[in-house]
Curated annotation (Swiss-Prot):
Family note: Belongs to the universal ribosomal protein uL10 family.
Keyword annotations of the record: Ribonucleoprotein, Ribosomal protein, RNA-binding, rRNA-binding
UniProt GO cellular component terms: large ribosomal subunit
Any one GO molecular function term: structural constituent of ribosome
Protein name (record): Large ribosomal subunit protein uL10
Classification via NCBIfam families: PRK00099.1-1
Length: 173
């Protein structure tokens, strides 16, 4: 690959990494072409890009991006899964692929500017989808004012009940 081509690859990868919500670094040593094609297909179906990269080019492309945290991990054979939407999707697909093919190893991940080790990437894969998390948060936030209104309305309701009981006693007497 000549210098101009390398510069083009670095520029394209840099742009992708800047837009990425998550980047997962994997070691693909031992995967056959068919297995790699299956993995790429599964990732592409969810709009996640999977690219084999030279470590030096990845090091250059990741400057001033969230994936810069991955630079110390760049050793051996590396490929990067770049997700643009829900950050858990690349981790979920790779973890699911790992159930049937243990040759693919998760090296690390970058979520924003935070470096995730392989265990943290696996934990990210266990998270529910973003929409579900937002729905749970909204439900929790909605429950707080509802509970507060119930508690606050309980005091006047009890006071009115006491007044009604006093009035009934006076009417009976």
């Amino acid at each position: 690959m000549n210098r101009a081509k390398k510069e083009q690859v670095v520029a394209e990868l840099h742009e992708k990494l800047q837009r990425a919500s998550a980047a997962i670094l994997t070691d693909f040593k031992g995967l056959t072409v068919a297995e790699m094609t299956d993995l790429r297909g599964a990732l592409a179906a969810e709009k996640v890009e999977y690219q084999v990269v030279k470590n030096t080019l990845m090091r250059l492309a990741s400057k001033d991006t969230g994936a810069e945290a991955l630079v110390p991990i760049l050793k051996g054979t590396c490929a990067v899964a770049i997700g643009y939407g829900d950050p858990s999707i690349p981790a979920k697909i790779i973890k699911k692929f790992n159930k049937t093919n243990e040759k693919l190893a998760i090296k690390a991940g970058a979520l924003g500017i935070r470096l995730l080790n392989s265990d943290q990437v696996a934990a990210l894969a266990e998270l529910p989808p973003r929409e579900e998390l937002l729905a749970k948060l909204l439900g929790t936030l909605n429950a707080l004012p509802t509970g507060l209104v119930t508690v606050l309305s309980g005091v006047p309701r009890a006071f009115v009940g006491v007044l009604a009981a006093i009035q009934r006693k006076r009417e009976e007497a």
